[in-house]
């Protein structure tokens, strides 16, 4: 059974929907598909905005990321927001009409990792736009009701879509143990580095140093809260003695320099996707008793993201530098090549 009423008025849901699909490496194609229906415990969301992530661009250009290979047509996009259009059995029909930010994960709630609260590590995870699971560059998607997070009317759909990369920043800052007075080094001033910079400041860091080889990106980092920016080719990164280092670049040199930059008993967090294997300065890690960990997506971060944005502690709207229609998704996937680009967003549905 699917409820399809809003405030007592019938909602006409289309039988078919649009999707912009990656049909082969470097080629997107608009197709028409049957509209999905929410299962028990799920909601149907009318997509309004989808942020373009570096992983989307990587699948578009390369057809794979590590073990995840695109072997059949795939709908990209996992940073999404919209409005609930229908609900499945077991979901309060009063949720229909709610504006939501989508946490694009479908874990198995019975797995040991999910039961431990680490559902992001669930081995049976179905994650949007990770082969073979389709993403959100389409008119409608279904998601577990608990993963469609209500957003305040003051939050734009574009900002709500970017709760996803913001959640990566939150998870990174949590792993780094950032608190009031922390000194933090962040390598990489791309979208993840920028949201992590904002989160670090919101968590109380008094010094946030952002390292990037691109001058324009360093300027962006300053705009979004970095206290200092450095060019790693021209500055001595290793002598910084910070409390925590977060790598959002994936660059081998940045990781090695960053590890050297951490004071004894400090923390190293690896977020950026780089080489599968890199040489590590093991004596530095051992002798300083550094804690080195990774971040894989996020868990239980959406309420924090909503609170930070609603309070004005994090600015997501200003990160959007380019907007495209669903039909222009292919252009959106290469927008990161535009000088000054921070984040491209695909507007699937206009208005509210």
Features from the language model and the residues they span:
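C-terminal hydrophobic helical "lid"/dimerization subdomain
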Residues: 2-19, 256, 299, 303-352
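Glycine-rich beta-strand-centered segment in the early N-terminal region that forms part
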Residues: 36-50, 65-112, 152-154
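Short N-terminal strand-loop motif that marks the start
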Residues: 1-79, 349-352
């Amino acid at each position: 059974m699917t409820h399809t009423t809003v405030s007592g008025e019938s909602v006409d849901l289309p039988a078919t929907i649009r999707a912009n699909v990656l049909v082969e490496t470097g080629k997107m194609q608009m197709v028409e598909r049957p509209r999905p229906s929410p299962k028990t415990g799920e909601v149907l969301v009318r997509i309004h905005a989808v942020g373009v992530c570096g992983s989307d661009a990587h699948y578009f250009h390369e057809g794979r990321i590590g073990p995840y290979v695109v072997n059949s047509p795939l709908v990209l996009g996992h940073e999404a927001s919209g409005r609930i259009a229908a609900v499945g059995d077991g979901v309060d029909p009063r949720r229909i009409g709610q504006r939501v930010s989508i946490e694009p994960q479908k874990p198995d709630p019975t797995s040991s990792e999910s039961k431990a609260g680490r559902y992001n590590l669930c081995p049976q995870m179905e994650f949007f736009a990770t082969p073979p699971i389709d993403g959100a560059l389409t008119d409608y998607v279904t998601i577990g009701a608990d993963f469609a997070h209500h957003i305040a009317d003051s939050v734009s759909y574009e900002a709500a879509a970017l709760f996803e990369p913001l959640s990566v920043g939150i998870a990174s800052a949590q792993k780094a143990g950032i608190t009031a007075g922390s000194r933090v080094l962040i390598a990489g001033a791309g979208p993840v580095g920028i949201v992590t910079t904002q989160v670090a400041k919101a968590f109380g860091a008094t010094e946030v140093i952002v390292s990037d080889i691109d001058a324009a990106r360093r300027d962006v980092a300053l705009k979004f809260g970095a206290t200092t920016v450095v060019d790693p080719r021209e500055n001595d990164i290793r002598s910084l003695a910070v409390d925590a280092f977060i790598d959002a670049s994936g660059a081998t040199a940045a990781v090695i320099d960053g590890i050297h930059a951490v004071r004894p008993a400090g923390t190293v967090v690896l977020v950026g996707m780089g080489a599968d294997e890199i040489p590590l300065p093991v004596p530095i890690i051992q002798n300083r008793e550094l804690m080195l960990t990774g971040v894989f997506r996020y868990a239980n971060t959406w309420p924090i993201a909503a609170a930070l944005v609603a309070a004005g502690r994090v600015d997501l709207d200003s990160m959007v530098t380019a907007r495209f229609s669903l039909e222009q998704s292919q252009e959106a996937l290469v927008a990161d090549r535009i000088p000054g680009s921070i984040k491209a967003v695909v507007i699937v549905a206009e208005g509210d």
